[in-house]
């Protein structure tokens, strides 16, 4: 994902945690808060309890890719933090992971019905 579409600083993550709402999707948790911008930004958290660096990085890469593919359908104007809750995210089939991410976004109400949105995620 391009830099403009990512949360980068600890303050940005803390603001989403403080001002946003939380949705539980089993192996994945989602925090979302409005950001008053014309685009949505995403951040990814993989706690150390999920395993070593290789496992955590694999989870983060896979979740980031699932979000990148769904990004054109995300409603602009949200900061969204995805929190991994299970080491199984490193091993489940990618279509299953995509469905999990999509379900979390739908529960949060930040997913548009059509896929007319931002593109060129690179």
From Swiss-Prot:
GO cellular component labels: ribonuclease P complex
EC number, UniProt record: 3.1.26.5
Self-association state and partner proteins as the record states: Consists of a catalytic RNA component (M1 or rnpB) and a protein subunit.
Annotated GO MF terms: 3'-tRNA processing endoribonuclease activity; ribonuclease P activity; tRNA binding
Function field: RNaseP catalyzes the removal of the 5'-leader sequence from pre-tRNA to produce the mature 5'-terminus. It can also cleave other RNA substrates such as 4.5S RNA. The protein component plays an auxiliary but essential role in vivo by binding to the 5'-leader sequence and broadening the substrate specificity of the ribozyme.
Organism, scientific name: Roseiflexus sp. (strain RS-1)
Record's protein name: Ribonuclease P protein component
InterPro entries listed in its UniProt record: Ribosomal_Su5_D2-typ_SF, Ribsml_uS5_D2-typ_fold_subgr, RNase_P, RNase_P_CS
UniProt xrefs under Gene3D superfamilies: 3.30.230.10
Any single biological process term in GO: tRNA 5'-leader removal
Family of the protein in this entry: Belongs to the RnpA family.
